[in-house]
């Protein structure tokens, strides 16, 4: 029996607590290295690309939010790229670890990478987000669905509706939830290697452990105790009907924990990907049972919890995004070349 399979069975009492601790240790060690690592200069976008560093005012969060931005042209649709559990405050993990701006240059899609949001699940928290660095306000859903699209529309000529949102790991479930509740804004949602049933089973306990390690945050400050309605409200498995009713175009990816020549050949990355895969398969079944018919499912026979695979998926989905968002490539623009 595979290691990950041993943790998926039912457990109660002492065995359940031991299971949470064991899985939590693996999750934490995986998150430390693979959901937002250290920035290296060579990983950033090449010089010459028209990447801007915006300071977007947020009344909801009481501060300016840094957003890395690349225009897709006048009246272009937007792609919001959301970071992982260990999102940094200086640059987006998407820019640190992938050439995302390069891939989407002249695609006709404006790319927005909000910076920050460690352990936030890009949600509106009940309470202040208090961690090792102090307390701040997390109202990310309000920012992403109201303040940021209004700013980009007014200042950068970006369409406020008909956008796409893609997230990895922590933010994969966030991307689906944002699309479920804001269908006019997000007609496309991509989830990469996410836990898609966070409110169920040991999910709240594991999320609490991970958030505590990634910044010292408390899950109860985010969504309250595990039986609070906010947990169900932010659970893609329980909100799959909304995605089907909205006819949202979704792209769901998860590997199986086996590395390929892309990399990620280490125990934490392998374990974590294998662990979340089951929830992705269940989500597919729930989507199909609800009558969904507008999805791409990539459950590869390889892939670990690491940026190499998430980047490959983002690059692969570009034509699908362009088609769904109605983007017009601007290959005649030589800016940034």
UniProtKB/Swiss-Prot annotation:
Its main location: secreted. GO terms for molecular function: diacylglycerol O-acyltransferase activity; trehalose O-mycolyltransferase activity. The keyword Zinc does not apply. Residues 101-111 are annotated as: Fibronectin-binding. Keywords: Acyltransferase, Cell wall, Cytoplasm, Disulfide bond, Secreted, Signal, Transferase. Its EC number is 2.3.1.122, 2.3.1.20. Gene3D superfamilies: alpha/beta hydrolase. Residues 1-42 form the signal peptide. The active site is at 169 (nucleophile), 273, 305. It catalyses: an acyl-CoA + a 1,2-diacyl-sn-glycerol = a triacyl-sn-glycerol + CoA; 2 alpha,alpha'-trehalose 6-mycolate = alpha,alpha'-trehalose 6,6'-bismycolate + alpha,alpha-trehalose. GO terms for cellular component: cytoplasm; extracellular region. It is an enzyme of class 2 (transferase). It is found in: Secreted, Cell wall; Cytoplasm. InterPro entries: AB_hydrolase_fold, Esterase-like, Mycobacterial_A85_antigen, TAT_signal. The keyword Cytoplasm applies. Disulfide bonds join 130-135. Substrate binds at residues 85-86, 169, 197, 275-278, 282, 305-307. The antigen 85 proteins (FbpA, FbpB, FbpC) are responsible for the high affinity of mycobacteria for fibronectin, a large adhesive glycoprotein, which facilitates the attachment of M.tuberculosis to murine alveolar macrophages (AMs). They also help to maintain the integrity of the cell wall by catalyzing the transfer of mycolic acids to cell wall arabinogalactan, and through the synthesis of alpha,alpha-trehalose dimycolate (TDM, cord factor). Belongs to the mycobacterial A85 antigen family. Homodimer. This is Diacylglycerol acyltransferase/mycolyltransferase Ag85A. The gene is fbpA.
């Amino acid at each position: 029996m595979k290691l990950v399979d041993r943790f998926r069975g039912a457990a109660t009492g002492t065995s359940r607590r031991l299971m949470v601790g064991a899985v939590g240790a693996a999750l934490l060690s995986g998150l430390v290295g693979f959901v937002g690592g250290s920035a290296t200069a060579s990983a950033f976008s090449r010089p010459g690309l028209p990447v801007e560093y915006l300071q977007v005012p947020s009344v909801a969060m009481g501060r300016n939010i840094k957003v890395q931005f690349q225009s897709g042209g006048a009246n272009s649709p937007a792609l919001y790229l959301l970071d992982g559990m260990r999102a940094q405050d200086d640059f987006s993990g998407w820019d640190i670890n992938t050439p995302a701006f390069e891939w989407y240059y002249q695609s006709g899609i404006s790319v927005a990478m909000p910076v920050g949001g460690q352990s936030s699940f890009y949600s509106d928290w009940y309470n202040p987000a208090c961690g090792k660095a102090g307390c701040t306000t997390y109202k990310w859903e309000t920012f992403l669905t109201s303040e940021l699209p209004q700013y980009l529309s007014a200042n950068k000529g970006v369409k406020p509706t008909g956008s796409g949102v893609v997230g990895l790991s922590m933010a994969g479930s966030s991307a689906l939830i944002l699309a479920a509740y804001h269908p006019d804004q997000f007609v496309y949602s991509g989830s990469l290697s996410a836990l898609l049933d966070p409110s169920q089973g040991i999910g709240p306990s594991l999320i609490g452990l991970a958030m505590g390690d990634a910044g010292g945050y408390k899950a109860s400050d985010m969504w309250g105790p595990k039986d609070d309605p906010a947990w169900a409200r932010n659970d893609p498995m329980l909100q799959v009907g909304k995605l089907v009713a909205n006819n949202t175009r979704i792209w769901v990816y998860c590997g199986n924990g086996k590395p390929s020549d892309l990399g990620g050949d280490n125990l934490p990355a392998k374990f974590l990907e294998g662990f979340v895969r089951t929830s992705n398969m269940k989500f597919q079944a729930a989507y199909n049972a609800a009558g969904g018919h507008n999805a791409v499912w990539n459950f590869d026979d390889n892939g670990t919890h690491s940026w190499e695979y998430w980047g490959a998926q983002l690059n692969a989905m570009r034509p699908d995004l362009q088609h769904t968002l109605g983007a017009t490539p601007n290959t005649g623009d030589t800016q940034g070349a």
